[in-house]
């Protein structure tokens, strides 16, 4: 198997992990903490040494994403598929917009310093990341419609959490493009991606 399918599977797992976190927040008001910290951490990695470094140095940190990717490639959950495929679509729009890419790079450059005095999962962190998503990513294309419990979705703080996770999904989607990922592969090379994802999952 070509090694690039492993990198493609890893990046897609990052996208799927972000999508799963969105679903967890929307339905339960809380999410897998390790997966959440990993996804948010990925946003601060602009020059990683390798692909694992994006996810806190270990692929075990995207276990939730690998599980979700494997499930999705076997039999798609329509709600979840709308999230991760929507993230891929928005990332495609982003790469075609020089203005949006420059704006995103500029905002992300200052994010580590802005968050220096706050925890990775603090309300301020969620708010900063959500604002970047709202200002730059959301206007690029069709909005991702999130469904869940009105008890949680009516809370502004939950909106911030969900948008921060969507921004993390965009980070992994950009990585997916960088390692050679394409939508055609999802249609025609699904088995290769699935095989790679299963192999990675079994080794973590």
Curated annotation (Swiss-Prot):
Where do transmembrane segments lie in this chain?
none
- Alphabetically ordered keywords of this record: Cell inner membrane, Cell membrane, Cytoplasm, Membrane
Any one annotated GO CC term = plasma membrane
Q: Mind telling me which InterPro entries this protein's record contains?
A: HflD, HflD-like_sf
User: Where primarily located?
Assistant: cytoplasm
- Has keyword Cell inner membrane? yes
Tell me what topology the record assigns in the membrane: Peripheral membrane protein
Q: Where does the UniProt annotation locate this protein?
A: Cytoplasm; Cell inner membrane
What does the similarity note say?
Belongs to the HflD family.
What is the protein name for this chain? Answer: High frequency lysogenization protein HflD homolog
Q: Which organism is it from?
A: Actinobacillus succinogenes (strain ATCC 55618 / DSM 22257 / CCUG 43843 / 130Z)
